[in-house]
Design a protein with these regions (language model features):
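Phosphate/pyrophosphate- and phosphate-bearing ligand-binding catalytic cores of soluble enzymes
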Residues: 16-17, 68, 154-276, 280-298
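A gly/ser-rich beta-alpha-beta helix-loop segment of oxidoreductase catalytic cores
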Residues: 111-149, 220, 224
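Short, electropositive, low-hydrophobicity segments enriched in small/polar residues
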Residues: 34-35, 67-69, 78, 105, ...
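Short acidic (Asp/Glu) patches
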Residues: 105, 135-137, 166-172
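Structural signature of FAD isoalloxazine-binding scaffolds in flavoprotein oxidoreductases
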Residues: 30, 37-42, 69-87, 134-165, ...
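Conserved active-site and cofactor/substrate-binding residues in soluble primary-metabolism enzymes
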Residues: 22, 40-43, 102, 106, ...
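Anion-binding (especially nucleotide phosphate/pyrophosphate-binding) glycine-rich loop
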Residues: 1-129
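Short, basic and Ser/Thr-rich N-terminal targeting/leader segments
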Residues: 55, 62-64, 147, 218-219, ...
Length: 298
């Protein structure tokens, strides 16, 4: 690790030691990262990945920190903070190209400014472009795969490659990047011309729905369980009388049973124990076996 620190410094790449990960995720849970690396552009990100590989240091790519749960003991390796990158959105006709570190909200606003429709569903999803593509994020009837055309990524071997959306095995909360270890660098989206006022109205309606239905006033990782075939996780959890059910500082949200929230001082252990208890009760009472949507990073 000392050698890696020296190499990062020589390359002009900023980093912090023992940085609390709770400060960098929407759940507000997690111990320290041994190294918290903050590349400012694609070149620094690629260099940081190469240095980690060369030094045999495990690494994790972090976007906006939604949909993840960091371990209480933290991460014994290097967390690469993509959200620190000075990425931008480029507009070419009806095509948008965005760096992995761009916030989804910024991407949606750019589409609105240029009168392009297709991304309204993503407005309010608390994540970056890279994270959204990685998990094929979606809401209110839309998914990233509906508008994604190509992705540029860094392979596990250190090569920069491009792939079409059809090559990414995009399905419900999944992409090929979960298996191939690739690092998303940028993504291109194909939209269609629309009326700015209609686009704005749709975005405002969906945001209002989020504020009304979701517990955005409390720390969480977003939707906690994947939607089982033929049912809805939140409805099953509510049906089992688990609204407000808690373990330590973690609880099933009173507002939306599909969310586990941090009531204050929750630990990773609290959340995992709660999820397992909820899963077991739902399985016993309904026959459905819920699968976590949030990713646990140890």
């Amino acid at each position: 690790m000392e050698q890696l620190k020296q190499l990062l410094t020589a390359a002009g790449i900023a980093y912090k030691e023992n940085e609390p990960l709770a400060a960098h995720c929407t759940f507000k849970i997690g111990g320290p990262a041994r190294l918290f690396v903050q590349p400012v552009d694609r070149a620094q990100l690629c260099r940081a990945v190469a240095l980690c590989k060369a030094q045999g240091v495990r690494y994790y790519l972090l976007g906006n920190g939604s949909n993840i749960l960091f371990a209480d003991e933290g991460y014994n390796g290097a967390v690469l903070d993509i959200s620190s990158m000075q990425d931008a959105v480029e507009v070419h006709g009806t095509q948008l190209t965005a760096g992995a570190g761009v916030r989804l909200s910024a991407l949606c606003k750019t589409a609105l400014e240029h009168g392009l429709t297709g991304l309204e569903f993503a407005y309010g999803i608390p994540g970056t472009v890279g994270g959204a593509v990685y998990m094929n994020a979606g809401a209110y009837g839309g998914e990233m795969k509906d508008v994604l055309t190509t992705v540029q990524y860094l392979t596990a071997e250190g090569e920069i490659k491009e792939a079409t959306a059809a090559e990414l095995d995009l399905r419900y909360r999944h992409s090929i990047f979960e298996e191939n270890g690739g690092c998303i660098l940028s993504a291109q989206f194909a939209l269609i011309p629309g009326e700015p006022e209609a686009i704005r109205t749709k975005m405002d309606e969906l945001m209002a729905k989020r504020l009304d239905k979701q517990p955005l006033d409390k720390p969480s990782a977003g939707s906690t369980f994947k939607r089982p075939v033929g049912a809805f996780a939140a409805a099953l959890i509510d049906q089992c009388g688990l609204r407000g059910y808690r373990h330590g500082g973690a609880a099933v949200s009173e507002k939306h049973c599909g969310f586990v929230v941090n009531l204050g001082g929750a630990t990773c252990a609290d959340v995992l124990a709660l999820c397992e208890e909820v899963r077991a009760i739902v399985k016993e009472k309904t026959g459905y076996d819920l699968e976590k949507e949030i990713r646990v990073v140890r």
